[in-house]
Amino acid sequence: MNPTLVVELSGDKTLEPHRLGGKAHSLNHLIHAGLPVPPAFCITAQAYRQFIEFAVPGALLDTGAPGNVRDMILSAAIPAPLDLAIRHACKQLGDGASLAVRSSALEEDGLTHSFAGQYDTYLHVRGDDEVVRKVQSCWASLWAERAAQYSRTSAAQSDIAVVLQIMVDADAAGVMFTQDPLTGDANHIVIDSCWGLGEGVVSGQVTTDSFILDKASGEIRERQIRHKPHYCQRDPQGRVTLLQTPEARRDAPSLTPEQLQQLARLARQTRMIYGAELDIEWAVKDDRVWLLQARPITTQAKPVQMLYANPWESDPTIKERAFFSRMDTGEIVTGLMTPLGLSFCQFYQKHIHGPAIKTMGLADIGDWQIYMGYLQGYVYLNISGSAYMLRQCPPTRDEMKFTTRYATADIDFSGYKNPYGPGVQGWAYLKSAWHWLKQQRHNLRSAGATVDAMIALRQRETRRFLALDLTTMTHQELERELSRIDGYFLDSCAAYMPFFLQSFALYDALALTCERYLKGRGNGLQNRIKASMNNLRTIEVTLGILSLVETVNRQPALKALFERHSAQELVTVLPTDPESRAFWQSDFSAFLFEFGARGRQEFELSLPRWNDDPSYLLQVMKMYLQHPVDLHTKLRETERLRHEDSAALLKAMPWFGRMKLKFITKLYGVMAERREATRPTFVTETWFYRRIMLEVLRRLEAQGLVKSADLPYVDFERFRAFMAGEQSAQEAFAADLIERNRHQHLLNLHAEEPPMAIVGGYQPRMKAPTAENAAGMLSGLAASPGKVVAKARVITDLLAQAGELQPNEILVARFTDASWTPLFALAAGIVTDIGSALSHSCIVAREFGIPAAVNLKNATQLINSGDTLILDGDSGTVIIQRGERADG
């Protein structure tokens, strides 16, 4: 084997970085120090240069056209001596061995430049021929636009080496940092670990455990043991696939104390060798720890600073005194969001929200900067700014009534004054009140027509969009399509907003009336009253799924397919199998036409909708087939209880109070129905945005400009600037921007969740450990009346864990949105960390007649699947009784 072309990484100190590239030199450095590194060879930078001189004409190199050079590299034959040397290295690593083929740029993994993700890496590669092809792909990645742009700004050399390394078939794997990545504290080692291969950690596909260790002693300072429903492993073809974690390991630590000590010792040694803080990829096999990669942390953490939800605010008084809350922000933005989701919310804030709220009757919609705010990946409403604007309207003239409904118990309003000022006064207020009154008259007269128009718009635009072939449309045609979506997105949000706000106002009026006339006896009534809301869209989805299940039950051959295949398999089986093709093309397609734009966190454009991935729907259908649900009977029983409860309480009220309550109840039901009828229209428009983004990224990936997998880290407003011709692809999808966004999202995942409501600044910190095996009572908000004793089922990943829910278990979740509704039909009760009186969990739980308690803050951390819970939906309390875990 020619050592100038291919060399074994043996720890030989004479092997220099300009031959090996950063990654290979780093591995060789670790091997020299005696650290455990899997066997590896390096195809040197000289080998790449020899190939380029042989395969690519100098004239082509001089043109500077990366795409043409890349194509030439991929199609050219490798000189025989080099080809033989690569194959010999494969043989040395083991015939049929599973290899990692990794790019090793000359300055990659250096102390000043990371290049993480800019050049190609291929894992679990088998066979000499495939290894040779992947080596060429790594060479070609040097000429990808994303890498070329990044390397120009970093002044990197234009040669590249490639590492061939034995893959560790890991029992557990992950990453560790030799300093706290959030705070920069160099006294800590932070470790993330999962079962199986580490690809799931890097990609975010799997849930991880987290550990914080004292660097000097290795003592465990904090640990977060999470429910881990899935892990990554290789299938027989060598492909990385997502598998269900065995029940016994789902809530068990993925690392033992001894393994943590091994990792801490290796972290200290590696840190000493490099003389810099590192992030290290590692794997454990048969209780032995292997180091896979070590990269200096080139983006140094800054000292922890106070964060503000409105960092753009220049007035320090407003910055310190503005009140922000994420209570009742709507399920479309509840929970942690990716950089793409956050940037889409900012697009909405700047271009949609203001014109949309004008339909509420606001004469002055203010400035976009006072609508919303953002903290560590979470979206907030600027309550101070909203209350200031709403003083234009007579019903919300008392701003503290509006403000306090968004507060949590820990917010102290003594001495609070709205930092934006007192709002409109005198003659200006009279004019704004008159404007509001005229708008309400218009809204009431046009409400029915508005609902009909929004339903028709959604159906018409869905039909039109599904008929488009995005792959054949030009850049300009896609840009025109985006502009069309902008217009209808604004129209549908403007139509929805009055119904949304009126529902809130009427629910508050309902609560006040119950309190005035019934005192404490009215709690159950205000939670059950809803005036024939059986047509809510969330209920329609579940009824639609049940209708599909009835169709399947009538066809034995089709039912057999559902019983034989997993939900993921059914996605490919149903469209092609003769027994199911008609069902897929008719009944199922009709359902998707109506509801397919639904999904989780619908402003989070990185998440697939049911049209994109129907496996969740198919999983629910499998559950309903196994555990039949009589939803119509359940809804009738709920209505009967509501009627009996209401009649008994109303009878004790004076006639005026009785008439007032009946009127509010009826009006609330009408507004809630209108709200739910118009909401799907703007949700559908967000799916159109997502589909066009995916198509554009597909094209850019083919040009080597960006990877489709980078979608969560793309900035939506930069994407729009690129589509409008205002920015180049290199500017809009700059590699360093994508990497910064990825890094920030990783920090948000590790950080403690910021408060639900906050005045002024917030100091971020890493997630604090929760009391393990805690038992006792949790208190939250009474959401849906009733009491139940049942086993808990904690679900933190809907798509991955939906199939775990068993009939008559209490569903425990961070929060729920419309996509969770089908599970409510099986649950005995609902418990959530986040929620309010009008959140999805409450509305649907009341409709299904099951008790619910929401806003318990950390229920998903304190409750384990299998615990016995005593859920009191009238008081909002949950008592945890530790016991045997539920099966499966």
From Swiss-Prot:
It is an enzyme of class 6 (ligase). InterPro entries: ATP_grasp_subdomain_1, PEP-util_enz_mobile_dom, PEP_Utilizing_Enz, Phosphohistidine_dom_sf, PPDK_AMP/ATP-bd. One of its GO terms (molecular function) is kinase activity. Disulfide bonds: none annotated. Belongs to the PigC family. GO terms for biological process: antibiotic biosynthetic process. Its EC number is 6.4.-.-. This is Prodigiosin synthesizing transferase PigC. It comes from the Bacteria. The keyword S-adenosyl-L-methionine does not apply. The gene is pigC. Keywords: Antibiotic biosynthesis, ATP-binding, Ligase, Nucleotide-binding. Involved in the biosynthesis of 2-methyl-3-n-amyl-pyrrole (MAP), one of the terminal products involved in the biosynthesis of the red antibiotic prodigiosin (Pig). Catalyzes the transfer of 2-methyl-3-n-amyl-pyrrole (MAP) to 4-methoxy-2,2'-bipyrrole-5-carbaldehyde (MBC) to yield prodigiosin. It is able to use substrates with a variety of monocyclic rings in place of the pyrrolic ring A of its natural substrate. Pathway: Antibiotic biosynthesis; prodigiosin biosynthesis. Pfam families: PEP-utilizers (PF00391), PPDK_N (PF01326).
